[in-house]
Design a protein with these regions (language model features):
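Alpha-helical transmembrane signal-anchor/signal-peptide segments
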Residues: 24-43
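Short conserved aromatic/hydrophobic patches within beta-strands of well-structured domains
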Residues: 44-48
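Short, solvent-exposed recognition patches
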Residues: 52-181
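N-terminal secretory-pathway/extracellular module detecting exported/lumenal segments
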Residues: 8-12, 32, 50
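Compositionally biased, intrinsically disordered/low-complexity regions enriched for serine, proline
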Residues: 20-24, 35, 104, 122
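A short, solvent-exposed beta-edge/loop patch
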Residues: 4-17, 23, 124-247
Length: 247
């Protein structure tokens, strides 16, 4: 009887010791992005409005440890535009928490849920100030206002920033995430960065309540604006010294 009790204690102790051999949860590495967007982009002439809170739907749809940063950037339209006209682009950062699947959703699926119809997808290379180039995914969508009588074109540009890399596709980010988990032994937070613009001429109101006339730009003009803005914005919000690969 004594031997049986001793054997049982030995088996229990041995079983409990196996807990220490179980694989540990991989450490969570930070993204190379900063959530603080600059107030002014001097070289390209953009000035940011006040910080914009995430919508109730965004907060409810994403995990609680997801972080948000969003601002509208404005600048005066060209000399040929009506007095007081402005160009506007919205920049947004969504930083994933521990549960990546419930923090960063595939943009091609999110936009249709917002009432936008995806028309086409392409790549837009942007040359940064240090000479390196990052690639943005460019989505062209068709939208309409609340009345359904005023269609417009919506352009959305996005990319992802991980611990040491930049990706411009959902699949590229997923493969990099899996590789780092298996080979490097860590999980990482990913930042989903977007710059977007509605190609519409309309009377608008900014965050301070001031009215202005939004200039309707062409797709080519909007692409140039995005390239100028991102070329200056990206080095301000991304620690490029930590980034080993750009795509």
């Amino acid at each position: 009887m004594f031997k049986r009790l001793l054997l049982l204690q030995f088996l229990i102790a041995g079983g409990l010791s196996l807990v220490f051999l179980l694989p540990k949860t991989p450490p969570l590495q930070p993204s190379a992005v900063s959530m603080e967007m600059p107030n002014v982009l001097v070289l390209s002439g953009w000035t940011a409005g006040p910080k914009i809170d995430p919508s109730k739907k965004e907060v409810e749809a994403l995990s609680k440890d997801t972080e948000f940063s969003r601002r509208n950037y404005y600048r005066s339209a060209g000399m040929d535009a009506p007095l007081g006209s402005r160009e506007m682009m919205q920049a947004s950062i969504v930083l994933s928490g521990k549960d990546l699947n419930n923090s960063v959703h595939r943009p091609e699926r999110c936009l249709p849920a917002q009432g936008l119809n995806l028309i086409s997808s392409s790549d837009l290379p942007v040359k940064l100030r240090d000479g390196r180039t990052i690639t943005l995914k460019r989505l062209k969508c068709a939208g309409n206002d609340n009345t359904g009588k005023n269609p417009y074109t919506h352009l959305n540009y996005y990319w992802f920033v991980g611990h040491d890399s930049i990706k411009h596709t959902h699949y590229g980010r997923t493969i990099k995430d899996m590789r780092d988990r298996l080979v490097q032994g860590y999980d990482q937070r990913w930042a989903y960065i977007t710059v977007s613009s509605n190609l519409v001429r309309a009377r608008m109101e900014d965050e301070t309540g001031q009215e202005y006339l939004s200039v309707q730009l062409s797709e080519e003009e909007t692409d140039r604006n995005v390239m100028e803005l991102v070329a200056e914005l990206a080095p301000e919000i991304i620690d490029l010294k930590k980034v080993k690969s750009l795509e």
